[in-house]
Regions:
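Alpha/beta-hydrolase fold nucleophile elbow
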Residues: 186-199
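Catalytic-loop region of hydrolases
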Residues: 21-85, 103
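N-terminal cap/lid subdomain of alpha/beta-hydrolase-fold enzymes
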Residues: 61-163
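Phosphate/oxyanion-binding active-site loops and adjacent basic polyanion-contact surfaces
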Residues: 60-66, 162-175, 199-205
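Bacterial Sec-dependent N-terminal signal peptides
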Residues: 1-23
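A catalytic-pocket lid/entrance helix-loop region that shapes and gates access to the active site
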Residues: 106-112, 202, 208-217
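Active-site catalytic microenvironments for nucleophilic, acid-base chemistry
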Residues: 75, 180, 210-214
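Glycine-rich nucleophile elbow surrounding the catalytic serine of serine-hydrolase chemistry
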Residues: 147, 196-209
C-alpha cells in the first residue's frame, strides 16, 4: 500500500511537472541591468551589465528567433560616441559566447590558475586584464546556444532551420541582429570590432563583410 501511494504521488508529480514544462514560454524581448565596480590595470571604475534577449525578425516583421546577450558598458565616459564597441562570439559553431565572456575579455572571469584549472573557492573574480577599461563589449549567443532559440510563429510553426544553420545563413541573420542591437543602443557612431574564437574567426570575417556591404556599417 505504501509503495502504491508513493507511485501515485510520483505519477501526479510527473503530470504536474510535464504540464508546467509545456506551458513555459521563451522570452522574446527582455532587458535587465545591474551596476558593478572593478579595477583594471590599477584603475577603478563602475560599469553596467545588461543581459537580455533580442529578436530576429522574419520577412513579415514577426520574431522567428530570440538571441540572448550580455552587454557591458563603462559608466561616466565623457566621449561615449567615440568609445569602441566589441562584438564577441565563440566558435563551434555550436558554442555560446561563455568562454570569451568568463575566461577572456569580460570584466568577471572564472577563478582559475595560470594553467586554466579551477581553484578554490570556486566561483568568479574580477578580471584584471578585461578590455572593459577601453571598450564596451557585447557577448552574443547564436541560435541554439546558451538561451538563444528559434520561436514559433502565430500558427505555432517553427521557422525553417536553413534560415539559421549554415555558413551563409549564420552570417545573414547575425548581421541583421547586430544592426538592430547597434540601433537600439545608439552605437552607430562608435568604432566597431568583431572578435571570435575558433569557428568564431570564420564567422566574424563573414560578418564584417556583410555588415559593410548590406548594412552600411
Amino acid at each position: 500500500m505504501t509503495s502504491m501511494k508513493y507511485l501515485c504521488s510520483l505519477l501526479l508529480f510527473l503530470v504536474i511537472y510535464t504540464s508546467n514544462s509545456q506551458s513555459r514560454t521563451i522570452p522574446v524581448d527582455t532587458l535587465v541591468k545591474t551596476t558593478h565596480n572593478t579595477t583594471v590595470k590599477g584603475q577603478s571604475f563602475s560599469y553596467t551589465a545588461e543581459t537580455g534577449t533580442q529578436p530576429v525578425w522574419d520577412k513579415n516583421g514577426d520574431p522567428m528567433a530570440t538571441l540572448f546577450y550580455t552587454y557591458y558598458t563603462r559608466n561616466n565616459v565623457k566621449d561615449s560616441a567615440n568609445r569602441p564597441l566589441i562584438i564577441s562570439f565563440n566558435g563551434g559553431p555550436g558554442s555560446a559566447s561563455v568562454w570569451m565572456h568568463v575566461a577572456y575579455t569580460g570584466p568577471r572571469i572564472l577563478n582559475i590558475d595560470e594553467e586554466g584549472y579551477p581553484v578554490q573557492p570556486y566561483g568568479f573574480r574580477n578580471n584584471p586584464n578585461s578590455i572593459i577599461d577601453v571598450a564596451d563589449i557585447v557577448f552574443v549567443n547564436p541560435v541554439n546556444t546558451g538561451y538563444s532559440r528559434m520561436i514559433p510563429d502565430k500558427e505555432n510553426k517553427m521557422p525553417e532551420k536553413e534560415l539559421f544553420f549554415g555558413i551563409n545563413a549564420d552570417i545573414k541573420y547575425l548581421t541583421e541582429w547586430v544592426n538592430t542591437f547597434v540601433s537600439r543602443h545608439n552605437r552607430w557612431e562608435s568604432p566597431k570590432y568583431i572578435i571570435g574564437e575558433s569557428y568564431g574567426g570564420t564567422r566574424v570575417m563573414g560578418l564584417a563583410n556583410e555588415l559593410q556591404s548590406s548594412q552600411w556599417m
